């Protein structure tokens, strides 16, 4: 079984072979990899930096293979990711340019079929920037703009039952 780690000193994602040997698999501003609940897969975004279009990568920790799970779609890029279960991830996808769209909307992606299902449908007034699972609920937060020129904002939070995601 392979492992994966983030080296904060070099800011790289490294694949760890069963022998202990390491190989850098991402060096362009990657996120810290997150493992699936059963620890057989990992996901990370690279690069994730201002106005740079990154990919969401899936790493199979059983064989060490890596693939792009979500690539930029026009100007829309993956910005944050968590695991829903062993077969699905939840990813924030949003506009990649400018200063207004700091977040985006939540999508569920099946890791086997790469089928993408939109969970939230906010316009640019609401920008989701973070998400987490707790007590069978999907919690998410970000900002809601309060003026017409999208300059002033307040904190925004909401929650969705994981059971309701089955209907999407």
Describe every region a protein language model picked out:
Residues 14-30, 62-78, 112-126, 162-168:
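Multi-bladed beta-propeller domains
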Residues 101-168:
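Acidic, small-residue rich beta-repeat scaffolds with periodic aromatic anchors
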Residues 61, 67-69, 79-81, 86-111:
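A generic tandem-repeat structural signature
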Residues 2, 78-79, 84, 133, ...:
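Eukaryotic scaffold repeat domains enriched in small/polar residues
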Residues 1-59, 153:
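Terminal domain-start segments
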Residues 47-51, 95-100, 144-149:
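Short glycine/acidic-enriched loop and turn motifs that connect beta-strands
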Residues 3, 44-45, 90-92, 139-142:
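Residue position within the beta-strands of beta-propeller blades
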């Amino acid at each position: 079984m392979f492992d994966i780690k983030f080296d904060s000193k070099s800011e790289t994602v490294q694949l760890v072979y069963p022998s202990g040997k390491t190989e850098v698999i991402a060096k362009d501003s990657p996120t810290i990899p997150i493992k699936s609940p059963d620890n057989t897969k990992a996901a990370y975004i690279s690069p994730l930096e201002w106005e740079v279009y990154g990919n969401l990568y899936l790493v199979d920790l059983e064989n060490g293979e890596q693939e792009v799970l979500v690539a930029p779609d026009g100007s829309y890029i993956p910005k944050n990711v968590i695991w829903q279960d062993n077969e699905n991830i939840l990813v924030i996808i949003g506009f990649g340019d400018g200063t207004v769209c700091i977040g985006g909307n939540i999508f569920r992606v099946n890791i086997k079929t790469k089928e993408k299902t939109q969970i939230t449908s906010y316009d640019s007034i609401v920008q989701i920037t973070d998400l987490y699972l707790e007590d069978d609920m999907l919690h998410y937060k970000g900002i809601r703009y309060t003026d017409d020129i999208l300059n002033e904002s307040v904190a925004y939070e909401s929650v969705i039952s994981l059971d309701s995601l089955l209907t999407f």
